[in-house]
Amino acid sequence: MFKNMTLLGTLIEHSDGLPLLETNMKNMHKDHNQDASLTLLASKYNVLFPGIYMPMTLENASIIRLVKKVYETGGIIGIVAQKKEDVEATSAQDIFTIGTTARILKLINLPDERVRILLQGEEKFQIEDVIAETPYLLASISRLKDKTSNTQSKHFKAVVSSIKETVAKLISLQPEFPTEIKLLLDNINDFNLLTYFLASGLDTDIKSKQKLLEIHDSKKRGTVLLKYLLKDLEVSKLRKKIQDKVHTDIEQLQHDFYIRRQIKVLQEELGENEFEDEIDELRAEGEKKQWPKEVADYFYKALDKAERLSPNSADYPVLISHAELMLELPWSVYTTDNMDLKMAKKVLDTEHYGLEKVKERLLEYLAVRKLTQNMKGPILCLYGPPGVGKTSLGKSIAKALNRKYVKVSLGGLHDEAEIRGHRKTYVGAMPGRIIKGIQNSGSSNPVFMLDELDKITDLRGDPAAALLEVLDPEQNQAFVDTFLEVPYDLSKVLFIATANQLDTIPPALRDRLEIIEINGYTIEEKLQIAKKYLFPKQRKENGLKATDLSIHDTAIVKVIESYTRESGVRELDRKLASLVRKVGKAMVLEEPYPKKIHKEDVISLLGIELFDQEMYQQTHLPGVAIGLAWTPVGGDILFIEAILSAGKGKLTLSGQLGDVMKESAMTAFTYLKANTNLLGIPDKVFESYDLHIHLPAGAVPKDGPSAGITLFAALASLYTQRKVKDKVAMTGEITLRGKVLPVGGIKEKILAAKRAGIKEVILSKENKKDIQEIKQKDIQDLKFHYVEFVEEVIQLALQPSKVEAAKDWSITKKRKQQPGIGHVSTL
């Protein structure tokens, strides 16, 4: 009974004793006209009864303004209960038709812009008609009066007596019941007030309370109230029975504990307490540890708890395994870093070709570590395509630093407990992978490789969010594993993450990473990697010596260009392994084999070529332009073909183009039409001919903005009948103002242009910095043109004169077809 004790406390605080309530009840019907209009306020969780106080918390701004106005003017407001708690009452259908008028006794502004009010119920009313529903409910009402029963009748006296008796029993079952409320109940002489008071405190639903409010006959209301009180009494008796049983069980547990302690003492006297020796051994090991006081206190507290438990208890092995983990962790144990920068550089160069940015960053870290001993470990993220050596670089870094190496594969990880650990209460609980890796390494400053960071999933919890604490240099000096439950310092750990793409890494996590991009290898770099690392490794793994087999550079280049298409070298490694195995098989079978593999031997050993290199193709037709494309496995060149045919100005795009590339084509076409005077193109050509733009290799999806200037060059060539210059390629985005914007993937595109035989490249002026990052020996035969506007592209890309047999677009005679071809690129 009286679940809402706050309500009763409010009543006691503001009633000032019974006479105030009696006076309110007697004067309740004064100075109010019948059928008056009244502003309504909906109550979600309770029913206000006449003569009763009730607090309410308001959040709606318009309702708060209304209530403040009523409070300041000392007016009254109608309180009606909502039919449903989970919706806002905005119409008459959402509320009951009978409510209680009220005065606002107190109004408090809360810090979060909400308002809390204290209401005093006065008299009941019935809604006759809703006048308005916005901004708040306004209704015409009629006042309702309770029907007073014959207080001298035997039935009435029996009801009153039963109610008071039942309430007394309820109070006796609840020792915590406030004394003030007991006194208040004993002194209420007005039966209506008594029933309303008890109804307001009933532990029942809002519909039952509304039912009591709507009963105007006091004797009938008392009878219904008595039923609710009797039901509440049965529930209270059952609750008391349960509480008594729980109390008895607790006493039994205490008794059992006392008996177990006696048994333990007897076991000690008999020398049978073998588990005590185990705990003593753990405590002795703990005394040898150099760990923080907080950790030591926790460790000894856990051992004390285990000592009090029976070895057969379910918690005992958990506490022991937890203590063993704490002992096995390398608290304050660090390996000594190799501070010889030259030696570290030699180790990195010996095992990995290229990757200059990563090596430079690592040497910077070592240099600063040499200058200061308190530097926190950086959080590096090696970002690049598969197979470029991101993961294997971790081992080399650990070797160069003279540190332990730990690798955790995050691909497919979907449970944050894998990172942060499980609670000890779970069956089979264990620490997370971070603490487990530290435990296995035996050092608190290993090189910790977090492989495939971009492939974490979040089916259960959010493992990426769990990594935020691990990878934040400001927080990881006190990382708390859920199983370990004490802080562990990860600030000296060198975390290195790897990722193939950044867009799948949450922004908050990416912000904590120092991103180092590793681009795909050039053919020259792949050649050097194959000569120095891959081929010798495969030869050794397959049981051959250097005197048995060698390979010519041209053969390696043949394998790279015709049998692999990747940014890294994984497939190249597999193809070289295949070459070595085939030679090894021939040796065992005593068949003839080449002791040095040349270019001509590759096809006979590996079979037909798998890939054709896209090469520049000379054409005499206008409407053809060469673009540069970026793909996940490197760069390539693509052709744009454009053709005009008799029609009505329709634009057709083909070649499986994405939305961005289609928009680039429309932008180029629109700019061309808007600037016909620039190229001397007659306006009528756009109305008399259909334009078709096509990108060959239609099965391959193409998208990106970098084909903008290539599309424009192809269209300008077609409409002016001036051919694009030989061996010229271009890349760049265009705008409707004719401005050329920078694009990405420049290194891969430029290397692809060189492989294809291109001699000149046109690109945005803002991409000049990207060219400067490419090794000069890789681009020494290329000439670069940097442009800001498409007018410059026309001067650089198109021949000054028209082709032979150039078409005259001013002649509008219908033709079967106007030849003119072209090719496009993607980003």
UniProtKB/Swiss-Prot annotation:
Protein EC: 3.4.21.53
Top-tier EC class: hydrolase
Catalyzed chemical reaction(s): Hydrolysis of proteins in presence of ATP
Superkingdom field: Bacteria
Binding site for ATP: 384-391
Domain Lon N-terminal: 38-233
Location(s) in or outside the cell: Cytoplasm
Keywords assigned by UniProt, alphabetized: ATP-binding, Cytoplasm, Hydrolase, Nucleotide-binding, Protease, Serine protease, Stress response
Catalytic residues, chain numbering: 706, 749
Principal subcellular localisation of the protein: cytoplasm
InterPro entries membership: AAA+_ATPase, ATPase_AAA_core, Lon_bac, Lon_bac/euk-typ, Lon_lid, Lon_proteolytic, Lon_Prtase, Lon_prtase_N
SUPFAM superfamilies membership: P-loop containing nucleoside triphosphate hydrolases, PUA domain-like, Ribosomal protein S5 domain 2-like
Triggers of expression: By heat shock.
MF (Gene Ontology): ATP binding; ATP hydrolysis activity; ATP-dependent peptidase activity; sequence-specific DNA binding; serine-type endopeptidase activity
Stretches assigned to the Lon proteolytic domain: 619-800
Gene Ontology terms: cellular component: cytoplasm
Pfam family name, one: Lon_lid
GO biological process: cellular response to heat; protein quality control for misfolded or incompletely synthesized proteins
Keyword Hydrolase included in the entry's annotation: yes
Family that this chain belongs to: Belongs to the peptidase S16 family.
Reported function: ATP-dependent serine protease that mediates the selective degradation of mutant and abnormal proteins as well as certain short-lived regulatory proteins. Required for cellular homeostasis and for survival from DNA damage and developmental changes induced by stress. Degrades polypeptides processively to yield small peptide fragments that are 5 to 10 amino acids long. Binds to DNA in a double-stranded, site-specific manner.
UniProt xrefs under PANTHER family: ATP DEPENDENT LON PROTEASE FAMILY MEMBER
Self-association and partners: Homohexamer. Organized in a ring with a central cavity.
Name of the molecule in the record: Lon protease
Protein encoded by which gene: lon
